[in-house]
Amino acid sequence: MAITAQMVKELREKTGAGMMDCKKALQETNGDIEQAIDFLREKGMAKAAKKADRVAAEGLTHIEVEGNKAAIIEVNCETDFVTKNDQFKQLLSELGKHIVANEPATVEEALQQKLHGDGETVESVITNAVAKIGEKISLRRFEVLEKTDNDAFGAYLHMGGTIGVLSLLEGTTDEQVGKDIAMHVAAVNPRYVTRDEVAEEEVNREREVLKTQALNEGKPENIVEKMVEGRLGKFFEDIVLLEQSFVKDPDQKVKKYVADKGAAVKTFVRYEVGEGMEKREENFAEEVMSQIKK
């Protein structure tokens, strides 16, 4: 398989490894990006965790709580200037209220519903906002959580909504505990609540990478397994909420903080504006020329 410059660029962005190392890794793995990442890690040429996807699109997250239901949404626009616009913020609020009340299953379904059950469709309301504000605006995603009277939501918006986290805790009605967990999730970005949620396939893959790393370091086989288990603990700390040191008190784990409050984390949803979206790249010289020609 031909290795393209774009493939090398993507691998470099994800691993931080050198260009020639990335090219060799792709050649060795027949162009498979995921295998190439493992190859680089086994050789000690890449960081243990992939770099986060480049965040490019603008917009805000918003959280709407109504009784025992709460919705977290992400709405995108083209520039961060628009996120400070009162009309854009009002649109966020209206969309949040609609979604928490109507619980559409998909974005497509939400767009076809009448806003608040009457009048214009959600899609038309967004289209009208585009005409007034002058930028493309889109409802990207949302999730609705439900609780009982004995549970608590935790809502946290970082930097006005560039990151939004909605948590759901059982066994407590203390919203501050929920917010503390939401703040931690915003800061540390775990992927799972408990170890049990991590797929066995993912754990086994990590174990193999760590084992190869240890052997490549020249460690004796009789201590490799112990080393691997030790490093697996760090792997779980990186991705599992309850295994992490609590950001507001690093001397204790999140697990202990929650247990001391008589609570349990049921779930959380974390949205970071634009994650996984690629911004259009333009050559700076070409951009200048295009402005001159106007």
UniProtKB/Swiss-Prot annotation:
Protein's UniProt name: Elongation factor Ts
Ranges where the record places region Involved in Mg(2+) ion dislocation from EF-Tu: 79-82
Family in the record: Belongs to the EF-Ts family.
Top-level lineage group: Bacteria
Pfam families: EF_TS
Keywords recorded for this protein, A-Z: Cytoplasm, Elongation factor, Protein biosynthesis
InterPro entries assigned: EF-Ts_dimer_sf, Transl_elong_EFTs/EF1B, Transl_elong_EFTs/EF1B_dimer, Transl_elong_Ts_CS, UBA-like_sf
Keyword presence, Protein biosynthesis: yes
A GO molecular-function descriptor: translation elongation factor activity
Entry's localization field: Cytoplasm
